[in-house]
Amino acid sequence: MGNAAAAKKGSEQESVKEFLAKAKEDFLKKWEDPSQNTAQLDHFDRIKTLGTGSFGRVMLVKHKESGNHYAMKILDKQKVVKLKQIEHTLNEKRILQAVNFPFLVKLEFSFKDNSNLYMVMEYVPGGEMFSHLRRIGRFSEPHARFYAAQIVLTFEYLHSLDLIYRDLKPENLLIDQQGYIQVTDFGFAKRVKGRTWTLCGTPEYLAPEIILSKGYNKAVDWWALGVLIYEMAAGYPPFFADQPIQIYEKIVSGKVRFPSHFSSDLKDLLRNLLQVDLTKRFGNLKNGVNDIKNHKWFATTDWIAIYQRKVEAPFIPKFKGPGDTSNFDDYEEEEIRVSINEKCGKEFTEF
């Protein structure tokens, strides 16, 4: 690298440092003093279910006053308690209302009533990366790299705030109107200085240290990035089997096989991300994220232009207008029932 290039890289790294320091100030203000009850259910018309989960659903709604469309996540308090997800749910809302980054879905309102918790987020009409990946089969390396770069920047931001994301997978990445990523579902995100021990995540994406019940840190997100890049470029994940236990055996074995069409730079990056030895895993070494950003596979990536959303996306999802749901599957609709008596009030006081 010439002197000029090195100097440019150095000054870029300096301005990133300044940016992250300021971002942390903004985050901490909201983290320490979270917003509460910023809307109510009758402010919205409910249109259609976009997805369902074990303790709730996500619905497309329209804000009556502004006419804006949003995605409303509705969580049944009793089910959250039964499934021991109180902590995770409180975490999700507290984190979402405090973060601010171009590739993180924005929480616009949150509130609760006798039965449910509600998080109202910006609606991302392009649907999940998962459905586009399955339809197309696999993404070309430049296409995969465009998305990967956004995740790298997002993790750099989150990790600088001591947040671990812990749930990277194509189902949690939505594609917006401009073809950029919006990371959604902060149900497993956690603010951790040092290490944590909770077993959570999706089998194919779990880092070996989580499976082996070791204390782990944000390096688990860099492992998951390796799994995601592999799955985007191959069309299937690096470790898969019928039963979770068989997947776990493959993950901890440290053996990965690559399709023959992977470029040598891609294979090299993945060997360094899907690295069982934490003292060698990229993202976890003394240069931190810069080992990843400066890797040859990302040589053509203009990180600042990606952050500013100035790079032309390789794929723009088709959609017919603000409330279009054609990029989402259909689900059976269910009435939202609200009890006349308060359920689980004290568990969720801080929501």
Curated annotation (Swiss-Prot):
The active site is at D167 (proton acceptor). GO terms for molecular function: ATP binding; cAMP-dependent protein kinase activity; magnesium ion binding; manganese ion binding; protein domain specific binding; protein kinase A regulatory subunit binding; protein kinase activity; protein kinase binding. This is cAMP-dependent protein kinase catalytic subunit alpha. The modification Phosphoserine is found at S11, S140, S339. Ubiquitously expressed. Isoform 2 is round spermatid specific. Phosphorylates a large number of substrates in the cytoplasm and the nucleus. Phosphorylates CDC25B, ABL1, NFKB1, CLDN3, PSMC5/RPT6, PJA2, RYR2, RORA, SOX9 and VASP. Regulates the abundance of compartmentalized pools of its regulatory subunits through phosphorylation of PJA2 which binds and ubiquitinates these subunits, leading to their subsequent proteolysis. RORA is activated by phosphorylation. Required for glucose-mediated adipogenic differentiation increase and osteogenic differentiation inhibition from osteoblasts. Involved in chondrogenesis by mediating phosphorylation of SOX9. Residues 44-298 form the Protein kinase domain. GO terms for biological process: adenylate cyclase-activating G protein-coupled receptor signaling pathway; adenylate cyclase-inhibiting G protein-coupled receptor signaling pathway; cAMP/PKA signal transduction; cellular response to cold; cellular response to glucagon stimulus; cellular response to glucose stimulus; cellular response to heat; cellular response to parathyroid hormone stimulus. It comes from Rattus norvegicus. It is a lipid-anchor. ATP binds at residues 50-58, 73, 122-128, 169-172. The gene is Prkaca. It catalyses: L-seryl-[protein] + ATP = O-phospho-L-seryl-[protein] + ADP + H(+); L-threonyl-[protein] + ATP = O-phospho-L-threonyl-[protein] + ADP + H(+). A lipid is attached at G2 (N-myristoyl glycine). Its EC number is 2.7.11.11. The modification Phosphotyrosine is found at Y331.
